[in-house]
Structures are given as structure tokens and as C-alpha cells.
Amino acid sequence: MKSLLFILAVLGSTLIIAQSPVGIFSNHADIGKPKIAGSAVFNTADQSYALKAGGYNIWFGRDEFHYAYNKIKGDFILTANFKLIGKGTDPHRKIGWMVRASDQDDAAHMTAVVHGDGLTTLQFRRLRGAYMRDPQDQLFSAKRNVEIIQLERLGKLFIMRIANAGEPLQEIGRTDAAELPDEVLAGIFMCSHNPDVPEEGLAWNVRIEQTVPDSHNGYRDGILASKLEIMNVFDGKRMIIHEDKGRFEAPNWMPDGKRLLFNQGGSIYTIPIEGGTPEMLNTGTAKRNNNDHVISFDGKMLGISSHRDGMPNGGSTVYYLPLAGGTPTMVTDSTPSYLHSWSPNGKELVYTAQRISKSPAFNIYKKPVNGGPEVQLTFNEKGLADGPEYSPDGKWIYYNANQTGTMQLWRMKPDGTGQEQLTFDEYNNWFAHISPDNKWIAFISFPTTIDPGDHPFYKRVLLRLMPVSGGAPKVIAYLYGGQGTINTPSWSPDSKRIAFVSNTGPINK
């Protein structure tokens, strides 16, 4: 019996040792026994991956490379930035994403890859042991030397998209992979294309997002996990600081720059920007807080939207209270009202509201915090005007509205005059957030397939940045999110970073 227990213990230890987690990946290993051993190292300071690998190639009937991967089922999106280090020896050294049936060297796979000479392709082996052919077993991109690679599985279909910094994703091709099992390996890889030479590469902003069908309703059909992220808007580097299987939303950056504030389960929480355990903020009798909460420009007060039982259309009501917590003071009697901004002088709150007696449309209103009449600023008879936010100098209120047929960004003077459209593209653009230095507008863009009057959960969305002074928007992030991602102001006090929420499956009922 002792001998049997000893053997079982050794086998158990072997199984544990065989798994080598790195960052978000449960394992990394050489595939195909390359002559030169590879490695994957996770840098916690910036959440990047340093890859090193040998390997003759990923081609013909078998492969050699280094692989960091997870087992995953169902539909998913893989997105990352990639860079090969140095000039390299072989022009076909390669780095990218791979989805693989197994860790066998002849396994079926789908590989989205950029080579040392800039060649960018979707390559595949449809059956185990099949001999990969050129050009039959790859889809070519006319664009070369890309940095951002995305590979999506949608049922049996695989879609590859690419971009460089600032660009929207461009689809280069799609193909089916009927022979790949539901459970696959998915991860980042590196291959030197020369068995006698190691090569190195980097991957950052590495994201694996499990998706749900477009018909999924985030209120009705279950929620996905939430990730709280911080991003430098100028270099695009992202950091995940907090994760939860439940739903949290809409981070605000606290005035000291050291903490974030967000809502979850009807309550308000704060968390250090390095991560840690969230702390609940006392909001008194307001127990059903939604994702419309805003910190005053002087950093002393918090405005919130909280639901009142028995009131029309959900009863969302605007309140304010000390940022340190305390008893809320009600501002809006009529519902629904959804807060989006303080005035810079702290005397008014501006919000979107539906007033059925005036119009079925949602319009923008403002009201003094210490009492006074509600003032209507937009007068749309149909559709939606939402997300009003004062510029730091108090000269403009930025907002989004869909009277042109798509949701676009607008601005107006604080009295509602001088309305002018700012964006003119095919996306549905929501929630203009102005940097504290009054130089930049960060906002979220939904795809053309979304109803212009809706900003639902769990969609393929973009975060974009444009100058306040005018100019074309550029993409700063690709993510799976939407409602709750960036509904309210989320700039850091130094105007260099924003905070936002992204989502991933599986579904939690």
C-alpha cells in the first residue's frame, strides 16, 4: 500500500509540474520538440509576454514552435499586439495567435500570423497530419507589417482581422474549421523558422474574450464576467486591475488619482488603481444605484442616479452626496432621469431624461443642485439625446444624439444654443468624455449592426480618441463590452489614462 501511495504521489507531482502557467495562460510549452527550447515570460509591470522560440516551421505535416495557451470551448475573440525583436535570421520567423486541436505536432490548427518580412496570413491545417500547401491553406493580407491581430471563432467559422495603432480592424479573411473540436487550445506562439536559431518577440494587450450570440440580452439572458481596465491613451497599453464573475460598470477616476469608483449590484465601490479589494461607499438610502455616477469638478461631491420603487419607467432619480459618503439629496422629482455631468462651478447637474408630457424622446436637461426649475436643452421629438457632459472650461456641453439616423457626437452651449455635430461616420458613437486638460475626447463606438438608439451589453466595440480642437478620431482599444464600459467620465486627473470595463464569458445566471 505504501508503494502504491508513493507512486500515486509521484504521478500527481508530475502532472502538476507538467503545467507551466504564465500570465493568463494555464500552460506554455514547446510543441514538436524543437532543437532549441523556447520560453514565455509574463511581465507583471505591464502585463506583456516575452516569447523566445526555435522551431523549423509551422507547415507541411508537422510543426515546431513555442506556445502559451488555454483550453477553451465555444465562441471567442483573441486580440493582441505583437512585435518581433531585432532583424532576425529568417524572414519567415513568425508570431501571432493559434487555435489548435491538441498539443500534438501534427494537430489541426488555425493560425493568425505576422512574419519577419511583414507577410500577414491566416494559415491552417484542416485535418490532423494533413500536408499544408501554399497557397491553398492560407489567406493572404494585402497589408503587411501589422501590429494588432485578432482571431475570432464563431461556430465553425474563423475570422482574422488586423490593424496598426489607431486604425479600425480590417478583416482579411474567414474560413471554416469543421474538424476542430469544440474544446480547443487557444494562445500566442512564436517560431524562428530555423531549427538552429532562437528568435524573440513580444505580445501585449493580450485578451481572450468568450462571446455570446448577438441575440443575447444582458438583462434577461444572464451576465458575463467583468474586467476593470486602465489604459494609457497615448501608447494604447492596457492593464487589468480587477476581475469579477458578476457585473460591475462605469469607472470614475477619483480626484487623488489613486482610486477608481464603480457601481455593482446597486452599490457604489472604490478600489485602488493597482487593484485589491473593493470598498463599499455609503450612499445612505440610495440602494439601487445604476451606472450613471459622476464626481464634481472640485472633487468634493458625488452625483448618482438611483432607482425609486413605484416611479415611472424604472424610477431613475438624480441625487448628490459627499464623495466620502453620506446622505443623498434628491435633485430630480420626475423620472426617469440619468445623470451624466456636473457643471464646473458645482451649481448644476446635467442629465438625460424622458418627460412624456413633452415628448416620447429622451432629451437633455439641467437643474440647480440646490433647487430651482428643470431646464430643457434639447427638443427632439423622437429618438435619443444622451450622455451630456460639460467641458472643464464650462463653455460647452458635449452629448450624443441620433437625429441624423446614426448615433453621433454633438456639442452645444450651456443654454442649449449653438448645437453642432462632431462625428460623421458609420459607427454609433456614445458618451463623449472630455479630458481634464480640455484637449481630448474619449468615446465608445458601437458597430453599424446595432440600433442607433441602443447601447447594449456584450458587443464588439471600439474606444476612440479625437482632439477637442477638431480632427479625425483614432481607435485606442478593441474590446468586448458596451453598456457599462465607459458610460461616465473616466479620465485620470493627469489626462493621460482612462478606465473602462470589458466583458467575457461564460454566462452567469
What residues fall within each predicted segment?
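Detector for intrinsically disordered, low-structure N-terminal pre-sequences
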Residues: 9, 15-16, 30, 349, ...
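Extracellular glycan-recognition regions
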Residues: 19-217
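Sequence signature of WD/YWTD-type beta-propeller architectures
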Residues: 213-509
